[in-house]
């Protein structure tokens, strides 16, 4: 780690803390040459591989925008959407890899959204699962009711 003051290549860690549910590590460092102190932030990368093969960084904001469309006209707060996005990210990171496919992201959204708002869940599921008929909706509603009664 190069010192931002004198560009010396060595520093020592004075303090280390995890933040943002353990996904980020903040380290307080001190240069071994000039004794200047600085902070580094280390964040693990979570990549999403899309259906067309393109890979991009996981974005909670993008996830929230997508779920917000399903919640349009519903009484779902921005804070609730942020918590949902955080829960989805925790679930995806718990899978252990640094790369997930977009299908995994959609699957991770379904259960927390079902708990948050039933109508928004059906809207999201209809797009995510590519419903093409009323039978698709009926089947999903039947499965939904079965899970709800458990």
From Swiss-Prot:
The gene is nrdR. Residues 46-136 form the ATP-cone domain. Belongs to the NrdR family. Its cofactor is Zn(2+). A zinc finger (unnamed) spans 3-34. One of its GO terms (biological process) is negative regulation of DNA-templated transcription. It comes from Corynebacterium kroppenstedtii (strain DSM 44385 / JCM 11950 / CIP 105744 / CCUG 35717). Signal peptide: none annotated. One of its GO terms (molecular function) is DNA binding. Keywords: ATP-binding, DNA-binding, Metal-binding, Nucleotide-binding, Repressor, Transcription, Transcription regulation, Zinc, Zinc-finger. The keyword Transferase does not apply. Disulfide bonds: none annotated. This is Transcriptional repressor NrdR. InterPro entries: ATP-cone_dom (IPR005144), NrdR-like_N (IPR055173), RNR_NrdR-like (IPR003796). NCBIfam families: transcriptional regulator NrdR (TIGR00244). Negatively regulates transcription of bacterial ribonucleotide reductase nrd genes and operons by binding to NrdR-boxes. Binds 1 zinc ion.
């Amino acid at each position: 780690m190069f010192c931002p003051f004198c560009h010396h290549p060595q520093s020592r860690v004075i303090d280390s803390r995890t933040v943002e549910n353990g996904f980020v590590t903040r380290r307080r460092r001190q240069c071994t040459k000039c004794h200047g102190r600085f902070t580094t932030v280390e964040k693990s990368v979570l990549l999403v591989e899309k259906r067309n093969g393109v890979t991009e960084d996981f974005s909670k904001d993008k996830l929230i925008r997508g779920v917000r469309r399903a919640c349009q006209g519903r009484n779902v707060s921005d804070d609730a959407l942020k918590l949902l996005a955080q829960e989805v990210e925790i679930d995806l990171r718990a899978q252990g890899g640094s790369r997930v496919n977009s299908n995994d992201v959609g699957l991770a959204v379904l259960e927390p959204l079902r708990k948050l708002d039933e109508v928004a869940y059906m809207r999201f599921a209809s797009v995510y699962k590519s419903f093409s008929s009323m039978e698709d909706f009926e089947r999903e509603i039947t499965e939904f009711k079965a899970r709800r009664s458990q």
